[in-house]
Amino acid sequence: MISCAEQRSRQGEAGRGPAPVAPAFLPIWLPRGCSGILSVPAVAMHSAGPPRAESSMSRQEKDAELDRRIVALRKKNQALLRRYQEIQEDRRQAEQGGMAVTTPALLRPDGLTVTISQVPGEKRVVSRNWARGTCGPGVMNEMVEDEDAEDHGGTFCLGELVELAVTMENKAEAKRIVSEKPTRARNQGTEGSPGGRMTRSPPTQVAISSDSAWKGAWEPRRSRPMGEPPEAGWDYAQWKQEREQIDLARLARHRDAQGDWRRPWDLDKAKPTLQDCSQLRGEGPARAGSRRGPRSHRKLQPPPLLPDGEGRGGQASRPSVAPATGSKARGKERLTGRARRWDMKEDKEELESQEGSQSTRETPSEEEQAQKQSGMEQGRLGSAPAASPALASPEGPKGESAASTASSVPCSPQEPDLTPLDLSLGGAGIPGPRESTCVLSLRPGAQESPVSWPEGSEQQPLGWNDHQAELEVQTCPEPQSGTGLPEPREDRSGKAGAQQGLAPRSRPPRGGSQRSRGTAGVRHRTGRPGPAGRC
C-alpha cells in the first residue's frame, strides 16, 4: 500500500519535470485511513524521452499538410480567375462582333435577335443585354475579318439587341439566332462591306449548329451577287430537296437488296406498281381540292339499272358520277351506305304521296258516284228515246268522254274506225232479229278492262282511277216481237251492285309506268266476232 506522503512526493517530482505536456490524472481508490480521491499523473508512469519525439513529428506532418492544401487552393483560385477572365473576354468579343455585322438602317428597329453561345467547360450562364447599335462600315470590315480568324460567328445588329449567352459543360461551341424580319424584300445592301450579304435570310430563321456548320451554312448566301434580290422560294426548294433525300434514304434502309421490307410489321404493305402510280397520278387534281382525297371507286358507281329503266324501288336512277371528281359531289350525292338507302326510302315515300294526292284530286267522291248511279237507273227506267240522252245528262263532259271512249275502242287492229253504237230501240215494223241495249249501268270498281289490246298499240290513259265509274254496255239478242219496251232487268243491276260491294280496292302498283288504271271496261257485241265478251 502507498502512503499519503509518498503520493505527495511523487506528485511534486512529476510537477517539477521538464515535460510541458499537461498531466493526465488517474483515479485511485484509497484505504479507509485516507479520505478522498487522489489523481496520479499518467506521465509519471512513462519515461520522458519518447513523448517528445512523437509530438515533434506530428507537428511537422500537420504543417506540411496545411501547406499542400494552401497550394492546392491557390491553384484552384488561379484557374477559376483565369477562366473567368477568358469568359469575360469572349463575351466582350461576341458583343463587338454582333454589333459590327450590319447597320441598323437595313432592318426595322423593332426586330429581335437572340444569340445563345456555348463555351466549353462552364456551367450555364444566361445574360441579357439591351443595346442600341450604331455601326459604321469600317467597324464592320474589321469584325468580319476577326470572324474569319476566330471561331465566333456573327449575330445580326438590330435596333434593339437582345443577347442570351448560354454556356454548357460540353466541348462544342454553338450559337442560336432567332431573328424576326419584315416580309417585304430588301433590295438595299452595303456595297463596300461583304458583311451586308449576310442580311439576306427568310422572314423567320432559327439556326442551331456548331461554328463550322454555321460558317458553311452562310457560304452559299455570300456567293450571291449584290444587286440580285433574294429568291422567294429558294429556301423552301432547298428544304424540300433535303426532305426528299432523307425520305428516300429512310425507305432504302427499311428495304433489303431484293426490295422487300426488313421489319415484319411492314410485310403487309403492298409494293407500288405501275397501275398504282397511274392511279395516284390521276388522283392528283382531286386531292388538290380535298384534303381527304377521293372516295373509293365502288362507292362512286351508280346503282345498277333494272330492265325497265328504273332504279331500286321504282325510283329514277341518279346521274352517274365520274370517279376522278368524287370530291366535288355535294348534297345527297355524297351519301353512302346506310345513309344512301335511307335517302332512297324517303324519296320513294314522297313519290307515293304525290301519286296519292293526284288520285284524290282526280277521283270524284263517293256521293257523286251514288248520284251518277241513281241518275243512270232513272234514265234506264224511262222511255226509249230518253235512253240515249241519259248518257250525257248525269255527268256532262265526263259522260260524253265515256261514250266516245266506248265507241272508239278498236276491236281489231285492221278496223280502227267503227260506227257509234246505236242505243235507241227500234219499232215493231222492222222484221228480223235485232240487237237492243239491255243494261246501262255505272259500276265503280278497280277491275281491268276485258278488252284485249293489240301489241304495238299504246294505251291512252283516260284520266280515270280506281274509284271512277265504269260504263258497261251489254247487248243481248232480242227475238222479233211487236211494239213495246223491253222490261229492264233488275237482276243484272242487283248483280252489279253486289259485285261493286265485293270488289276489293286494289292498290296502284309502284312506279310511274304507262299502264292506265281504272279505264272503262267496254263489252259490246257486233255482227262480226271480236275480242269483246258476249252476253
Curated annotation (Swiss-Prot):
Pfam families: DUF4594 (PF15266). InterPro entries: DUF4594 (IPR029336). Residues 60-97 form a coiled coil. The keyword Phosphoprotein applies. Residues 383-394, 509-518 have a biased composition (Low complexity). Residues 201-212, 402-411 have a biased composition (Polar residues). The modification Phosphoserine is found at residues 201, 393. The keyword Transcription regulation does not apply. Keywords: Coiled coil, Phosphoprotein. Residues 175-233, 263-535 are annotated as: Disordered. This is Coiled-coil domain-containing protein 9B. It comes from Pongo abelii.
